[in-house]
Amino acid sequence: MMFKTTILAAAMVAFSALTVQAHVGLSFPCARYHPAAGCPAPPAGQSIDYDINAPIGTSDSINRPICKHTVPYTKRSTFKAGQTIQTKYSVGAPHGGGHCQWALSYDNGKTWVVIKTMIRECLRGAQAGYSVPVQIPANAPSGKATFMWLWNNAIGNRELYSNCADIEIQGKNGGQLQGVAPLIANYGKGSPVIGEFPLATQPDGKELFAKRKAVTITVKAK
């Protein structure tokens, strides 16, 4: 019986490792409930997400909310306005790369402003250690913020991936952050659909990014 129990435990550990390696997830700044060493413990009532790399939805269905998890960490990483974050990813299957967006919110995900966009080339050929530099805007106000990563893959099922990290920004006291709202595509029926684009000659939906709505985030001075 002890032998069977040991085998079962080993199998569960192996399955968890394989699950984390499937697809791609944000690992730095630590995505909410990421199992990586060094990431904070989940807040009370939440648990480590061993399926952190899984998509949150497809063009036909919504599996999880934007960010994947909505309860923020109690411990946050601190970055300065104007600082460049070398974002990192747990890479399993990069699906030929695709489109990525990074955005900030100061109201826990109600309003987002995009701070970087990569068309087609994001995660193309990505392997362990893959990193993308993302700069916090120099005029970003101080305060608690949510840092979001979105990815629409080039090859495979029409999916949307999203992870969020909880950060503290040290910038000016109050102010505005202007930009565009993120494109939320391949996320349930009725959402914009970006088809597969494994070849450079195939339509990739980039025209949808040009239609993103302008948005202004206002943070009150303290």
Go through the PLM ranges and name each one.
Residues 149-151:
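Conserved structural position at the C-terminal beta-strand
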